[in-house]
Amino acid sequence: MYNYPLHKKINLSKIKQVIVSVGGCTNEEIFTMIKNLNQKKIILMYGYQIYPTTSRNLRLLKIKKLKEKLKNKNIVFGYADHSPNGLLETVYNCSSSIAMGATIIEKHYDPNPEIKKKDEDTSAIDTNSFNELIYTINICKPNIGKNIIWLDKDESKYRKSVSRSFFSKGDLKKDSKFTFDNI
């Protein structure tokens, strides 16, 4: 991250995009790196830098805050997941990161989970879990919607249909008038 001579070499190279892990980095280090690599498309991969990572440590809001601060830059945001507790926690964490603005997910993959591994590999998921994660993420992505704050066409139509309706608190006698007491 703070290898400034490397930043200069990358900037002068023909490399078009750079993937940078920013977990464990200060905001100052991140902003300096972005300034140094201003000629490149940058992919910032955020992940809490303890293996394995518990969900309460994630601080995924950092993705959203960095995205807001760097909105005019040529930057893509991603999330590197190190969840140790299986598919469900992985799905929650990855889906939450997408809601915060991540568009790339990194997840350790282990095609042979039955073989004993080092402690750092406890966050890896098997083939079936990986496929399930991809399926779930593809369902979640459209839920975020577009960056609009007004009603869409369907909401406007529905609102129009219900805003003209009256409902009584009980049965009304013939020819009775609506009042605030009976609607």
Could you tell me what each predicted segment is?
Residues M1-I183:
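Catalytic cores and adjacent flexible loops of soluble metabolic enzymes
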